[in-house]
């Protein structure tokens, strides 16, 4: 700011310069005019304080013509200075507050992170424990499921055996009833037998209802879900990683914590279960038949697998996987053979080999692909054809020589398809006007024949008296049931099941006819080879006269089946003794046997009840 004194000095100098420019008097003139005399001097005065505080606004147009005074300039400067000072103070206070809050937040964040780190460690341990427990539980459930499937398969085999035994019982009763009906002699009068076919029918219906029950686990629990845990590469997405690197140290501690991700994998109908899939969880491995590791059940070794007997089940390692080997005891009819599993997978079964292929025993059950829903093939064993030979083991065996039992199939889509179907034919046996249907079995080898005993006996008696007269008497005896054929039984075609052949029967029988008569004929008449070929001996009784010196000649012809035996006896009364029970004690007798082989013909009854012969 210029003072008034300086302003006046400047004005005076300017005026002097203008005066000199306007006239050019000589320098001496200035002095002559009084220029050399000192004039009055400017006196400096003190400026008074600015009393005016409100100054009008000075626009840009007025700036050249009007210049603001010093008081106005000072007031404006002070006003701006106060405004800036207040702003700076506010910013400083805010900065102090923010610094304090930042320190507090950092301390609090550090405490929270420490707490979270402990919680995260506990949660991770809990997750690992949960995974182990879930895997253990899943393995136990798998063991139970496999045991259930194994037991269901055993139940199915037992149900099939029960059904076969029921059919055999019904067939046996019908066979017994047919034999009793065909016997019109003493056996028909002594024994009354009735077959309750309706009861068998009801039992078969109940058994079919029981077999139709699906015992396998449901489809929902066949494929158990699997829990998988994996480590997460980073707790935050990639776009935020750079920001996390610039974050405070307290936040960077989160990167040191290991984060895991838990996924529950479910399997559908096309998926694989944990014990059967290629991708498996921790510590879960399927077993193998040779080396049952984590999935072997053990060996089931029953003793004598017969009625009322039970086997011994020796479990292996109780871990999920395949079943062991089930070995029965005696391979008797109706018993099961060795069950060797194939691949240890759900619903699969191995090869079921029977013992002896006797009636009632099962054949080989070879499954297809041991996957859920696969079907196996049940091949029956070879059963002996019916035989009518004297040394055969059954009389008119009504079991077909090559029965068509159908297929034993196990199918299902996870219910292990275990719907077992067993198709059979039917056996039709006619007796009179009654038709008997046995289950669904079909005779493929022809009609069922039943052998009946019948005989025709011709007795010729020749008596020569002392005076030379000869009396000849012929007597013909015919019997349809063999009851009037005498004490001898020439039933060559009848055999005894489960009793052996006729040789065993002769040894077991205690009848005097088979003991004394056969020995006497072998020793005295020399007909042992003939009787050995026939397999049995036969004779007829003869009568003797009470007159003395009488010559008795007796001839007997017996026609049985396809052979005939003729016996002739020549005796003197004085040499003959009492003949009892066909034993020729001390007698000089000669017996001739003539046999003529004929093809055996079976006798069966027509629907009208009349017997007929079939070649």
Swiss-Prot record:
Glycans are attached at residue 325. Disulfide bonds join 455-485. The keyword Coiled coil applies. One of its GO terms (biological process) is fibrinolysis. GO terms for molecular function: protein-macromolecule adaptor activity; signaling receptor binding. One of its GO terms (cellular component) is fibrinogen complex. Residues 267-427, 530-615 are annotated as: Disordered. Cleaved by the protease thrombin to yield monomers which, together with fibrinogen beta (FGB) and fibrinogen gamma (FGG), polymerize to form an insoluble fibrin matrix. Fibrin has a major function in hemostasis as one of the primary components of blood clots. In addition, functions during the early stages of wound repair to stabilize the lesion and guide cell migration during re-epithelialization. Was originally thought to be essential for platelet aggregation, based on in vitro studies using anticoagulated blood. Residues 293-302, 550-560 have a biased composition (Polar residues). Residues 1-19 form the signal peptide. Keywords: Adaptive immunity, Blood coagulation, Coiled coil, Disulfide bond, Glycoprotein, Hemostasis, Immunity, Innate immunity, Secreted, Signal. Residues 71-602 form a coiled coil. Residues 591-601 have a biased composition (Basic residues). It is found in: Secreted. The record marks 38-39 as: Cleavage. InterPro entries: FIB_ANG-like, Fibrinogen_a/b/g_coil_dom, Fibrinogen_aC. This is Fibrinogen alpha chain. Its main location: secreted. The keyword Glycoprotein applies. Conversion of fibrinogen to fibrin is triggered by thrombin, which cleaves fibrinopeptides A and B from alpha and beta chains, and thus exposes the N-terminal polymerization sites responsible for the formation of the soft clot. The soft clot is converted into the hard clot by factor XIIIA which catalyzes the epsilon-(gamma-glutamyl)lysine cross-linking between gamma chains (stronger) and between alpha chains (weaker) of different monomers. Forms F13A-mediated cross-links between a glutamine and the epsilon-amino group of a lysine residue, forming fibronectin-fibrinogen heteropolymers. Residues 373-396, 537-549 have a biased composition (Low complexity).
